[in-house]
């Protein structure tokens, strides 16, 4: 594998939008066929978790953009993310003729996960681990599809924010990182796209409340990744396949987050 590995984090309501998911995987197929570049997908699936918990009569809250995960709920959340969401992604890959392997953060020790904050319950902090398994899978021509469920050294299932998980995986692989969500990138106070975002500007926008909640988590993860990887991280949308192909080919799309 001579070409730089690319980690793509898929988020937002994508998993509930079958048409968009189909278009995305068609774009990824074109990219893989044309570029022959190693690719890793990392996904969450918060909308599936919300639907499942609601169906079970359970409540779900967030604190600073992170889902509070009571330990009694983690079996359901792990089932939604590592089970349903992961296999839905796998199904699209297979239907698009992309050979893929479904994984979680614990497989092969890819990421080291510990409890982030007791107040959040079974929510994990994610650090880069051993990339050997994923590197081997990539070397065999498969697409790793990784859910954001981790396991601690004590064997406890943990729900990890998918942006943070993708960052840790990119660090472990020394890869480029693209974060795809519902929005076209980072937006300013007037709803306009910010093409380039540095740490000083990002902190200022967060202090003013322009960037908050889930987007703040995303920006912090992107800043951390940009600093660790020593290169910009892109935050863009999955909604426009033509723009996505341009982005994957190195074009300027979305927001470039740099230190």
From Swiss-Prot:
Keywords: Amino-acid biosynthesis, Arginine biosynthesis, ATP-binding, Cytoplasm, Kinase, Nucleotide-binding, Transferase. It is found in: Cytoplasm. It comes from the Bacteria. Transmembrane segments: none annotated. Substrate binds at residues 45-46, 67, 159. The keyword ATP-binding applies. It holds the Pfam family AA_kinase. It catalyses: N-acetyl-L-glutamate + ATP = N-acetyl-L-glutamyl 5-phosphate + ADP. Catalyzes the ATP-dependent phosphorylation of N-acetyl-L-glutamate. Belongs to the acetylglutamate kinase family. ArgB subfamily. This is Acetylglutamate kinase. The gene is argB.
């Amino acid at each position: 594998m001579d070409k730089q590995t690319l980690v793509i984090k898929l988020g937002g309501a994508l998993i509930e939008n079958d048409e968009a998911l189909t278009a995305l995987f068609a774009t990824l197929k074109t990219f893989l066929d044309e570029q022959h570049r190693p690719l890793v997908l990392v996904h969450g699936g918060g909308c599936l978790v919300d639907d499942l918990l609601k169906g079970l009569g359970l409540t779900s809250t967030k604190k600073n953009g992170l889902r509070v995960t009571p330990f009694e709920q983690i079996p359901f959340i792990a089932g939604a993310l590592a089970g349903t969401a992961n296999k839905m992604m796998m199904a699209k890959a297979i239907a698009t003729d992309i050979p893929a392997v479904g994984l979680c953060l614990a497989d092969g020790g890819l990421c080291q996960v510990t409890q982030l904050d007791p107040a959040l319950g079974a929510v994990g902090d994610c650090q880069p681990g051993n990339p050997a398994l994923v590197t081997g899978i990539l070397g065999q021509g498969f697409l790793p599809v990784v859910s954001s469920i981790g396991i601690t050294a004590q064997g406890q299932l943990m729900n990890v924010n998918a942006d943070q998980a993708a960052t840790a995986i990119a660090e472990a692989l020394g890869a480029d990182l693209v974060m795809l969500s519902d929005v076209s990138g980072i937006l300013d106070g007037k709803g306009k796209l910010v093409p380039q975002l540095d740490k000083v500007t990002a902190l200022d926008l967060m202090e003013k409340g322009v960037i908050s909640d889930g987007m703040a988590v995303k920006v912090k993860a992107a800043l951390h990744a940009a600093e660790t990887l020593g290169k910009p991280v892109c935050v863009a949308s999955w909604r426009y396949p033509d723009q996505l192909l341009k982005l994957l080919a190195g074009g300027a799309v979305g927001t470039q987050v740099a230190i």
